[in-house]
From Swiss-Prot:
<feature type="active site" description="Proton donor/acceptor">
    <location>
        <position position="137"/>
    </location>
</feature>
<feature type="binding site">
    <location>
        <begin position="111"/>
        <end position="116"/>
    </location>
    <ligand>
        <name>dCTP</name>
    </ligand>
</feature>
<comment type="function">
    <text>Catalyzes the deamination of dCTP to dUTP.</text>
</comment>
<dbReference type="GO" id="GO:0008829">
    <property type="term" value="F:dCTP deaminase activity"/>
</dbReference>
<keyword id="KW-0546">Nucleotide metabolism</keyword>
<feature type="binding site">
    <location>
        <position position="156"/>
    </location>
    <ligand>
        <name>dCTP</name>
    </ligand>
</feature>
<comment type="subunit">
    <text>Homotrimer.</text>
</comment>
<dbReference type="InterPro" id="IPR033704">
    <property type="entry name" value="dUTPase_trimeric"/>
</dbReference>
<keyword id="KW-0378">Hydrolase</keyword>
<feature type="binding site">
    <location>
        <position position="170"/>
    </location>
    <ligand>
        <name>dCTP</name>
    </ligand>
</feature>
<dbReference type="GO" id="GO:0000166">
    <property type="term" value="F:nucleotide binding"/>
</dbReference>
<comment type="pathway">
    <text>Pyrimidine metabolism; dUMP biosynthesis; dUMP from dCTP (dUTP route): step 1/2.</text>
</comment>
<dbReference type="InterPro" id="IPR036157">
    <property type="entry name" value="dUTPase-like_sf"/>
</dbReference>
<dbReference type="GO" id="GO:0015949">
    <property type="term" value="P:nucleobase-containing small molecule interconversion"/>
</dbReference>
<feature type="binding site">
    <location>
        <position position="180"/>
    </location>
    <ligand>
        <name>dCTP</name>
    </ligand>
</feature>
<dbReference type="GO" id="GO:0006229">
    <property type="term" value="P:dUTP biosynthetic process"/>
</dbReference>
<comment type="similarity">
    <text>Belongs to the dCTP deaminase family.</text>
</comment>
């Protein structure tokens, strides 16, 4: 599975709306100052976190059950910064909306800027023909509160091309997260 280059990413973003909104270059500074980088890199695309967050809390004594998820386990926040409690996690989403081609599998890796602070970003692969905003899971592995920034880079997407097209894509099998918008909670 060869990895796709910046040229391919730009071409697909422009002709097939692979990523929207799309930043064709790497951005490290905006009019308001330095930011954690986002946009196109040599062999990937650094996504931004939107300003919508769901902060995990245990104030409602919920049990985390992926087959019967209780949304009361989260507090909603709309802000430019989110503080993750110690040893806890937050859900967010990308600014960017993705449309993955049928012959592509997309892998997401966290940025080292956050990893070096004990903040881990987890995203499952974006499967062939999946589309939507990517729900981001941020884990604070430290004993201190940790900060994440909206509208700045948080993770990198790598696009891998298969040697042949799959028989059944995510769209074909009616994947439950197809077309998701906003921060999406677990669906059984």
């Amino acid at each position: 599975m060869p990895i796709k280059s910046d040229k391919w990413i730009r071409r697909m973003a422009e002709s097939h709306q692979l990523i929207y909104p799309f930043e064709p270059k790497q951005v490290r500074e905006t009019p308001s100052g330095k930011v954690i980088s986002y946009g196109t890199s040599s062999y990937g695309y650094d996504v931004r976190c939107a300003d919508e967050f769901k902060i995990f809390t245990n104030i409602n004594a919920s049990i985390v059950d992926p087959k019967n998820f209780d949304p009361n386990g989260f507090i909603d926040l709309k802000a430019n910064v989110c503080i993750i409690p110690p040893n806890s996690f937050v859900l967010a989403r990308t600014v960017e909306y993705f449309k993955i081609p049928r012959n592509i599998l997309t892998i997401c890796l966290g940025k080292s800027t956050y990893a070096r602070c004990g903040i881990i970003v987890n995203v499952t692969p974006l499967e062939p023909e999946w589309e939507g905003h990517v729900t981001l899971e941020f884990s604070n592995t430290t004993n201190l509160p940790a900060k994440i920034y909206a509208n700045e880079g948080v993770a990198q997407m790598l696009f891998l091309e298969s040697d042949e097209v799959c028989d059944i894509s995510y769209k074909d099998r009616g994947g439950k997260y197809q077309g998701q918008k906003g921060v999406t909670l677990p669906v059984a």
